[in-house]
């Protein structure tokens, strides 16, 4: 690590800063570190196949870059359209090798910055860096703030129309001109925009090849587009409000009143901000983002046109206003990260007594609600041939050649993964329906293998053969809980967000 920092830290003997990534491309130990990074990376229990290719070698990247600069411009290959003229070899294979090596090297400054920022919190309770990568870490962030807000902007982030925009975005982070020239040469030589984005429809997906390299470029581009929110958020907000649920208890109520008096005594203008501040709340996952506010519809409409003009002017994008939708939180549900999220009123009754008179007060408290979308889940199961489009379980013929234990293990793994990911659902009834479909599909697959009916097979083998499905949701209750519950029964009934979910496999991949 000291060798790496030597290229990235300023030199005390000169006025220039090293900050050079290009020399690292030709250092032997970099590829050894990259290899160890790929093997020792923390994996989610949902990520069964890391996708690490044992035939891949980072040492080849050095030789490829050398050949790129020693190319013969008079050499032409006419036999294979997928071969690069100056390499004479498979173009997609070499592009993957170079992109993976370059992606690891260009991530080094960001990793060092993350380590230094986390080290500054010594003595304080913070989540570990790998927990911050969890998909579920976003939901407590939504849960704590969305109950205060009124309107939300559903935004589909536009993709860059030209590869040069990606290179220009990195100029603010990578000061090494040689690395930028190599990146520009590599992008224009190997790729076009169509190879990066597989679909230009709303909710587009990215190419499955060279994912690490492209995600780094895309995240840099999105970070640049989101940088304006940081500035505007700091300009418009000075004091956060307290959760509505906390106001039911008097100790928190008096605490908030004391805070108001303290702020009022110091700065009267800040007290006005508490009541007039629209309180923006922004969150993003992949290509979809949400901007919520407690302002009016007119304010949200202004934000909509501001974002359109911002993307058009800064990134030369023709961004249609139809990609941004204004919805009221109390009337609409949002399909976000596999959940149907909404804000609903939760009635609460409080008993109050003054002297000899007692009376009841009905309060409506806003609550962030998360539901499991049953129709998309059944569609995924039908696509993977576990059931029909109507949700009727069917057998999985392609697994009939496996052993009984392997068949049960595969079905049980899918069931556990679904229960693990959707543990934050407010209502678990949908999950038990999915569990029933998978359990019956497993039984029919086993019966098909043994050439018998489901009833005959279960009677001969015993119901304990599928016992794994009965305990699938209890086997994952050993991880981090952001919220503690007062009782064990409350843990099983409440929403649970886990901090080890980095990705979830598509059911269609189980062939």
Swiss-Prot record:
In terms of domain of life, where is this protein from?
Answer: Eukaryota
Q: Name one GO biological process term.
A: RNA splicing
Say yes or no: keyword RNA-binding present.
Answer: yes
Q: Tell me yes or no: is ATP-binding among this UniProt entry's keywords.
A: no
- Write one Gene Ontology MF term: RNA binding
A single GO CC term, please? chloroplast
Q: What is its main location?
A: plastid
Where is this protein found? Plastid, Chloroplast
Q: Which UniProt keywords apply?
A: Chloroplast, mRNA processing, Plastid, RNA-binding, tRNA processing
Function in brief: Usually encoded in the trnK tRNA gene intron. Probably assists in splicing its own and other chloroplast group II introns.
Q: Which family does it belong to?
A: Belongs to the intron maturase 2 family. MatK subfamily.
The family database entries (HAMAP family) matched by this protein are listed as:
MatK
This protein is called Maturase K
